[in-house]
Amino acid sequence: MRFSQLIASLQQGSAGLQDHQLAEDPELLSGASLDQAKANQLSFLEQGNALTTQLSHSKVGAVLIPPQDDLRVIAEQRGLAFAVLRDPRLAFAEALEQLHPRSRPKAGVHPTAVIGDQVHLGQGISIGAHVVIGDGSRIGAYSVVHPGVVIYEDVVVGEANELHANAVLQPGSRLGLNCVVHSNAVVGSEGFGFVPTANGWRKMPQTGLVVLEDGVEVGCGSTIDRPSVGETRIGAGTKIDNLVQIGHGVVTGQGCALASQVGIAGGARLGEGVILAGQVGVANRAVIGDRAIASSKSGIHGEVEAGEVVSGYPAIPNRLWLRCSATFSKLPEMAKMLRKLTRDTPQ
């Protein structure tokens, strides 16, 4: 694709194209990071990006930059093809969709698929090899079910969903529109519910539902448990990374982002736009307000207020955590000084 064609596409996008220079209008085959890009590749820079200095000697064919004078001057001096955009990262995402259009599997049901009784399959769907669909389940129109997926009984999958190889939807799972479930993820698995008795643990039946609202994406190997009663609900547009555990009865607001190895215990509540970085742990019935952020390895108990940024275990306001962190390495010397003061102080 010529850079000029890409510019025409970006003009229709939402990244805010402001200006561009075609230079020699290079033919672009793919995208790459600026430090590795070749003459037939596209890259981008954001304000404050650590790779900014690479622009002076990168071999990139064309680059997407923010409205930043120093970057524009470098691009012009080097004769690079470039575009100035309000949001270069978003533009790069839109460009990659043009450079790497995804192929859709052919519609139809593979002969090795096992389809239960009273299953409804919408128009234009693609069912891959060795898929199993349980009795009474419904798969919406234009959905893609890749090989090896197992869909239990009484599952509802809305329109235009994509279930990648070996994903599992257990009984009572409900998916809205345009959801993506990646390989080896399990939606609707039984919650960790047991009742202590004199004879050991008695299993609590997990009869509830798991609901993924529209546009939810679930990463590889992640699990979302169903509760004993009621539902576990993942808000629209929420993105879940690989290897995330979401316990029974958890409810998230819209547009949350949960990074790898996050663990959320049963009954926790997340507001809209919450961001949990890698390995964050959320305790049973904790409440996290809208647009709160937890940095990596934070341990959240109780309540986090809306818009707050927390760190550490137990999680405390980020600024306080940074101050505490700065003292950790000094603790041995401080303890030594304290012992000396104690010895030298008259009793």
Swiss-Prot record:
A GO BP annotation: lipid A biosynthetic process
Keywords: Acyltransferase, Lipid A biosynthesis, Lipid biosynthesis, Lipid metabolism, Repeat, Transferase
SUPFAM superfamilies according to UniProt: Trimeric LpxA-like enzymes (SSF51161)
Pathway: Bacterial outer membrane biogenesis; LPS lipid A biosynthesis
Database matches in NCBIfam families: lipid_A_lpxD, PRK00892.1
EC number: 2.3.1.191
HAMAP family: LpxD (MF_00523)
Record function comment: Catalyzes the N-acylation of UDP-3-O-acylglucosamine using 3-hydroxyacyl-ACP as the acyl donor. Is involved in the biosynthesis of lipid A, a phosphorylated glycolipid that anchors the lipopolysaccharide to the outer membrane of the cell.
Highest taxon, organism lineage: Bacteria
GO MF terms, alphabetically ordered: N-acyltransferase activity; structural constituent of carboxysome shell
Keyword Isomerase: no
Species of provenance: Prochlorococcus marinus (strain MIT 9313)
Family named by the database record: Belongs to the transferase hexapeptide repeat family. LpxD subfamily.
Reactions catalysed, as given in the entry: a UDP-3-O-[(3R)-3-hydroxyacyl]-alpha-D-glucosamine + a (3R)-hydroxyacyl-[ACP] = a UDP-2-N,3-O-bis[(3R)-3-hydroxyacyl]-alpha-D-glucosamine + holo-[ACP] + H(+)
GO cellular component terms attached to this protein's record: carboxysome; membrane
Pfam families found in the cross-reference section: Hexapep, LpxD
Gene responsible for this protein: lpxD
Identification of the protein by name: UDP-3-O-acylglucosamine N-acyltransferase
